[in-house]
């Protein structure tokens, strides 16, 4: 038997001796009631509501004698009609669950088909699908089987087998279970490329109402430990403690990843050391306080964690969780505003250095008086606007407090968030494109990072005109209201919020604005749709 597997077995047995799980929950992980194909159909379908999976962010190439690679450009994705990613083998290890979260289809009280994969079955499926070029990697999540520690043991055993016995060198994203031990969290970080812990809801009140078995502290605690461990491992191999961001961020002094913003965030955090009250005015302050109260500024300290890492991973040739960590929030299950969601998002990026925050429009599945009624259309357009706002935070130098406020807590869904912001700050427009700096250009609707870079480069060598701006990628149907080129507007239009709003809505008006959600269903394409199963 492989030395790593022997080590894992010893650790697992030691942890099981400490494990206090509900012995009345008699669930056999081998579950002989279903074939592997039937389990795949059940558990792939059960995983479709988890959207927190994208490309790897890793640069690990293929190796002789090993299977797969995690090169960033090699993780290619197909998307279903509703935007769900289907290129990873996205499955649950089990949909048995000891928790009774009201929003979840797999909640304990639901009468649904239950199945559980063994680690070997998951490995076989991953390798066989990869060899057939159906998938590019594995996204593994799970319900709570017996208890968090037992569940994480089985998930880590699966990853260990993939990395050692099957020599799988491809991309792996694991959804960790809050409440599992630090030992298992450490081993998951060495074995997977990306780790995520779902925040689920942006407030403690929302969690208490819909997920009584979960607390914000138990979710943020592993998130903070993973962040600290990633930072220490990055520094150990000569990199910055912070995750790599878009190169354009170095020109955005007001962005959430700028040195000034990081110092301000640290200053706010330190200012709370003598203040035991959690501010109710800002979700960012709430997350800062949780980070301090739960002692999150410490790396995972299990000295034997490297023993679970396959070969070269244990010698710091590869960062701990090289693709970083992510999380997911449900949109529309509770009454939080866009402002609360965006403030929470910014706090997660700054306080926990998350690589991505994902949003999932809630699809009513369960009958409960605190949830939207079954048949209520999911807020897909709101989800889309939040993703656009998320990009403004990560790539355009905006802060959450600029985009929304307590006085205006929600986006105008009829126009994109950047236009919404510009219309509330018309005193800053029009912008002269031949003189404005990169950061100012990025705040103009219709101008993105690439076109802003092209503008700043091209104007060194000559004058610009609207034809050249169009060739550079500027979306003039939105931008022309907010810019001048050579002191002239493209059309003579009044700089008035009501007029521009009407024009933008008419320009961008498509069928989605008049969608009538009648007899519609929202489903994710599965592997069976492609004739895989």
Model-flagged regions — what are they?
Residues 91-120:
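Canonical Radical SAM [4Fe-4S] cluster-binding loop centered on the CxxxCxxC motif
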Residues 2-96, 475, 483-484, 491-521, ...:
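Flexible, acidic/Gly-rich N-terminal and inter-domain linker regions that tether
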Residues 60-61, 241-248, 362-367, 402-418:
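A glycine-rich phosphate-binding loop feature that marks nucleotide/adenosyl-phosphate handling sites
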Residues 123, 146-398:
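Conserved AdoMet/S-adenosylmethionine-binding subsite of the radical SAM
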Residues 89-91, 120-131, 312-313:
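Short, charged beta->alpha transition segments
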Residues 127-141:
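Short Fe-S-cluster ligation motifs
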Residues 372-440, 481-503, 507-508:
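Long, highly charged, low-complexity intrinsically disordered interaction regions
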């Amino acid at each position: 038997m492989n030395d790593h597997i022997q080590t894992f077995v010893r650790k697992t047995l030691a942890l099981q001796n400490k494990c206090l799980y509900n012995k009345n929950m008699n669930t056999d992980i081998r579950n002989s009631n279903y074939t592997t194909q039937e389990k795949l159909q059940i558990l792939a379908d059960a995983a479709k509501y988890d959207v927190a999976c994208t490309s790897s962010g890793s640069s690990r190439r293929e190796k002789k004698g090993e299977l797969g690679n995690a090169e960033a450009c090699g993780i290619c994705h197909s998307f279903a009609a509703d935007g769900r990613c289907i290129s990873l083998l996205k499955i649950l290890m089990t949909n048995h669950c000891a928790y009774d979260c009201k929003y979840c289809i797999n909640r304990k009280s639901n009468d649904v088909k239950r199945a559980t994969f063994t680690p070997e079955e998951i490995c076989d499926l991953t390798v066989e699908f990869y060899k057939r070029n159906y998938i590019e990697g594995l996204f593994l999540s799970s319900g709570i089987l017996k208890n968090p520690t037992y569940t994480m043991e089985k998930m880590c055993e699966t990853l260990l087998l993939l990395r050692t016995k099957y020599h799988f060198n491809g991309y792996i994203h694991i959804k960790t279970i809050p409440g599992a031990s630090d030992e298992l969290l450490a081993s998951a970080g060495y074995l997977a490329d990306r780790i995520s812990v779902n925040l689920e809801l942006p407030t403690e009140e929302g969690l208490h109402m819909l997920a009584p078995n979960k607390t914000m502290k138990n979710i943020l605690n592993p998130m903070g430990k993973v962040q600290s461990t990633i930072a220490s491992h990055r520094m150990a191999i000569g990199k910055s403690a912070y995750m790599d961001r878009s190169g354009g961020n170095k020109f955005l002094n007001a962005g959430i990843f700028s040195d000034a913003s990081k110092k301000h965030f640290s200053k706010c955090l330190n200012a709370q050391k003598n203040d035991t009250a959690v501010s109710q005015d800002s979700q960012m302050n709430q997350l800062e306080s949780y980070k301090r109260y739960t002692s999150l500024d410490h790396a995972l300290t299990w000295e034997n964690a490297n023993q679970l890492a396959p070969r070269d991973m244990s010698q710091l040739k590869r960062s701990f969780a090289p693709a970083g960590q992510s999380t997911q929030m449900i949109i529309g299950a509770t009454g939080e505003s866009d402002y609360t969601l965006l403030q929470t998002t910014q706090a997660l990026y700054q306080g926990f250095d998350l690589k991505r925050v994902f949003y999932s429009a809630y699809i009513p599945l369960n009958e409960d008086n605190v949830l939207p009624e079954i048949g209520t259309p999911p807020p897909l357009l709101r989800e889309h606007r939040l993703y656009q706002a998320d990009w403004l935070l990560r790539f355009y130098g905006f802060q959450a407090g600029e985009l929304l406020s307590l006085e205006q807590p929600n986006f105008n869904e009829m126009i994109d968030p950047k236009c919404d912001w510009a219309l509330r700050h018309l005193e800053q427009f029009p912008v002269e494109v031949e003189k404005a700096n990169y950061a100012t250009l990025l705040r103009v609707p219709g101008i993105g990072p690439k076109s802003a870079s092209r503008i700043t480069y091209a104007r060194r060598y000559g004058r610009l005109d609207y034809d050249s701006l169009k060739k550079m990628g500027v979306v003039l149907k939105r931008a022309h209201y907010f810019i001048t080129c050579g002191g002239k507007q493209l059309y003579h239009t009044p700089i008035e919020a009501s007029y521009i709003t009407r024009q933008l809505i008419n320009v961008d008006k498509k069928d989605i604005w008049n969608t009538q959600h009648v007899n519609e269903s929202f489903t994710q394409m599965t592997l069976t749709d492609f004739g895989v199963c």
